[in-house]
Amino acid sequence: DVVANFFMGRELTSTRLGLRWLREAEMEEVTRQALVDIGTRIPNVRSKVGTLSGGQRQAIELCRFVHFGGRLVLLDEPFAALGVAQTRRGLELVEAVKRRGVAVIVITHNVLHALQVADRIVVMRQGRIVGERRREETGHDEIVALITGG
């Protein structure tokens, strides 16, 4: 479920009478609050992760990363398999993660996505950097020209 996925390898436990017990209620509340803090809504944190949308699963991963102190996240084509609404939500999540002081590197072939979330855009062609621009100093046409060599 979502709680088990969120705490994977970091479960909260107590020891009583020599036995370790999971602090399920506390883990559930921490998970719920962490999701709220980053702006993600999952109706039931006891839902099986496999029943959630791709966007919801990505949100859980990002939320877990931020909650446990991650400082840099690398997202490789994070929106490739998502629908329009899920992609919009994913872009919002990237912005939320950035606002929390986490550095985010997004690898994408979608110029519009890059322009929406990037502070800097680095264009590579055939394994070489062919251009680097600050988002506020460039636009769609210039980035496409760098990509295509035009």
Q: Can you say where each PLM-predicted feature lies in the sequence?
A:
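Glycine-rich phosphate-binding loops of nucleotide-dependent enzymes
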Residues: 1-150
